[in-house]
Amino acid sequence: MYKQKGFTLIELMIVIAIIGILAAIALPLYQDHMAKAQINRVFYELGSTKTAVESILAHGGIPTVDPSQDGVVQNSRRLEFLGLNQNPNSNLIFTASVGLNSNQFERVNATFGRNALPQIQGAVISFVRDNQGQWTCEIDKSNAAYCPPKYTPATCVTI
């Protein structure tokens, strides 16, 4: 009697089909988790600047992301370097900026770029401070290819 050695062609094709189906399901889920993780990472990196901003404002200064402006007096207020460069060494943040409104601090922004996933590149995450010192988080996804609200942290608002 002849004994079978190995797998038949149909068995191998079934295994390959199962692997293909699993990969088709897993890849989009993986990309979603990566996008969420990258947004959360920048959320916490940028959120760490809130303490420095509060300290600078408490001393009557204006935060800046340009180290060359540190100590410069502008409109009778001293600019102080925030510790976050315009072009940080982050592999996710492309640019960082400070938003002023009538020479008053309003927000700190970070734009996704560099090694961020393509669907979130161009999105801008901002921490906005009101006159009472309350902070809110905003994500402007208008320049991003695909950035659904499910990617954003619970405390952020998408605009």
Curated annotation (Swiss-Prot):
N-methylphenylalanine modification, residue list: F7
SUPFAM superfamilies attached to this UniProt entry: Pili subunits
Record lineage: Bacteria, Pseudomonadati, Pseudomonadota, Betaproteobacteria, Neisseriales
Keywords for the protein's UniProt record, in alphabetical order: Disulfide bond, Fimbrium, Membrane, Methylation, Transmembrane, Transmembrane helix
Ranges annotated as spanning the membrane: 7-29
GO CC terms in record: membrane; pilus
Chief localisation class: other
Compartmental location: Fimbrium; Membrane
Topological type in the membrane: Single-pass membrane protein
Any one GO BP annotation for this protein: cell adhesion
GN (gene name): ecpB
Residues making up the propeptide: 1-6
InterPro entries: N_methyl_site (IPR012902), Pilin (IPR001082), Pilin-like (IPR045584), T4P/T2SS_Core (IPR050470)
Protein name according to UniProt: Fimbrial protein EcpB
Family the entry assigns: Belongs to the N-Me-Phe pilin family.
Disulfide bonds: C137-C156
Keyword Transmembrane among UniProt keywords: yes
